[in-house]
From Swiss-Prot:
S-adenosyl-L-methionine binds at L76, G108, F127, G128, R129, M130, T131, L132. Homodimer. It comes from the Bacteria. Specifically methylates the pseudouridine at position 1915 (m3Psi1915) in 23S rRNA. This is Ribosomal RNA large subunit methyltransferase H. Its main location: cytoplasm. It is found in: Cytoplasm. Signal peptide: none annotated. Pfam families: SPOUT_MTase (PF02590).
């Protein structure tokens, strides 16, 4: 099994790239992490609700094209389930032991995720009700994936 992180938008800030690279390096071959960046749709100024939904659908189609049949899909959503690091570790462990494909985490674009992505998801995770920049959220998620692996291996990293 591999863990994939499918994200809408490019990472621009060097300090975030460096932080993510550090955690990816630490994971090494334990449970490889692949990050797939998808181009975000350009949102016109004063976009109508219909235009915004069409953009979300296009981004959703791009996301779903990266998900395979046996993959376990976890999406980040404000209204999702609040989880502790231990609960996330348990989810990762179960996907590793019982899964038939890869474990895929998704961070959508600034408009959110399409209904189709929500319907395909196996788990909706919330990191709280606060709004965070998607680029920062990527670093936080990668750290939590690393932490989950350390918990599952009994490492002292998680105290």
């Amino acid at each position: 099994m591999k863990i994939k992180l499918v994200v809408v938008g490019k990472l621009k800030e060097k300090y975030l790239k460096d932080g993510i690279a550090e955690y990816v390096k630490r994971m090494g071959t334990m449970l490889p992490l692949e990050i797939i960046e998808l181009a975000d749709e350009k949102i016109p100024d004063n976009a109508s609700e219909k235009e915004a939904e069409a953009l979300k659908k296009r981004e959703g189609d791009k996301i779903l094209s990266r998900i395979q049949t046996g993959d376990k899909l976890a999406i980040l959503a404000i209204q999702g389930k609040l989880m502790s690091s231990e609960e996330l570790a348990d989810f990762v462990k179960k996907a590793e032991v019982y899964g038939t494909g890869n474990l895929v985490f998704v961070i959508g674009g600034s408009l959110g995720l399409s209904d189709e992505v929500y319907k395909r998801s196996d788990l909706q995770i919330s990191f709280g009700r606060m709004t965070l920049p998607h680029q920062l959220m990527r670093l936080v998620l990668v750290e939590q994936i690393y932490r989950a692996q350390m918990i599952n291996r009994g490492s002292a990293y998680h105290k």
